[in-house]
A protein has these predicted regions:
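Short, well-ordered beta-strand elements
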Residues: 2-12, 67-71, 90-93, 127-129, ...
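N-terminal lobe/hinge region of extracytoplasmic solute-binding protein
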Residues: 9-64, 95, 199
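Short, solvent-exposed loop/turn elements at domain surfaces
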Residues: 14-22, 47-50, 80-81, 137-140, ...
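Aromatic- and charge-enriched surface segment that lines or borders ligand/interaction sites
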Residues: 56-104, 128
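Short, hydrophobic/aromatic-enriched beta-strand segments in well-ordered soluble domains
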Residues: 71-75, 125-135, 216-221
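Surface-exposed binding/hinge segments that line
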Residues: 108-181, 210
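Alpha-helix-centered segments that form part of catalytic cores
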Residues: 179-209
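Ligand-site clamp/hinge motif
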Residues: 191-195, 222-235
Length: 235
């Protein structure tokens, strides 16, 4: 063990590292937070929500039983290839949670009050969640881990249908061969374990994943969060 290494003994293997399809607690609580990020997360001292990918907690508007939550992404936030994290990545991530052919049963109930996401052509860092009013809506929507569309859907297959169609479980989607091909790949063990495919905006990248032996992550050089490292505990 070198001075810049930390070795942690786990009682069991992580089942995978796909934030949508992997449900085991070890992966979700101890490994994935190093690789993936969300709009918001919890301050471990106060247990209040604090911004991570978002610039701030959302502005919330209520209209009867409908709520709208406005978020804006941090301008510093980028993926490993240097491209900015945008509204397209947010919408894509939520489409994977609602796509009927994706193994997403562990996540879908936590956001089943969502009706749609509004995007803004003049500002690709701004989004508005439109949902049924729900007491846990800010943390439910804000803490879902965001995926890079360019890695997980390079052909932009899920863009064929709007998010509202995925939420409504539109029959056209269920019968679409391209969506089925996407889902089969997204559900695969390779996408949950291959270091070239397990990609997020967090401070660490997956180096190797050997069942029964070790899982190695490495801190990224020139990580985007280093630019705002005094913002909060997540940087």
């Amino acid at each position: 063990v070198y001075k810049d290494q930390v070795v942690i003994h786990g009682l069991s293997d992580a089942k995978g590292l796909n934030p949508v399809t992997t449900s085991d607690a070890y992966a979700n609580e101890y490994i994935m937070p190093n690789i993936f990020q969300s709009l918001l997360s919890y301050d471990h001292q106060t247990m209040g929500l604090i911004p991570v990918l978002a610039k701030a907690r959302p502005t919330v508007r209520l209209n009867g039983d409908v709520a709208e939550l406005d978020f804006e992404l941090r301008p510093e936030a980028t993926w490993d290839n240097g491209t900015p994290i945008t509204a397209d990545d947010i919408v894509f991530s939520f489409k994977t949670v609602f796509c009927s052919m994706v193994n997403n049963d562990n996540l879908k109930p936590s956001v089943d009050y969502l009706k749609d996401i509004k995007t803004y052509p003049d500002n690709n860092r701004k989004i508005t969640f439109i949902c049924n009013k729900y007491i846990g809506m800010e943390d439910g929507l804000g803490t879902l881990r965001i995926l890079p569309e360019y890695v997980y859907d390079p052909q932009k297959v899920l863009r064929k249908y709007p998010l509202s169609n995925y939420i409504a479980a539109n029959h056209s989607i269920a019968n679409d061969a391209a969506i089925k091909t996407f889902a089969d790949n997204f559900n695969s063990e390779k996408v949950a374990r291959d270091s070239s495919l397990v990609k997020g905006s967090g401070a660490y990248r997956l180096i190797s994943f050997e069942t029964g032996q070790r899982l190695i992550v490495e801190r990224k050089a020139n990580w985007w969060g280093d630019k705002i490292n005094k913002e909060n505990e997540y940087f």
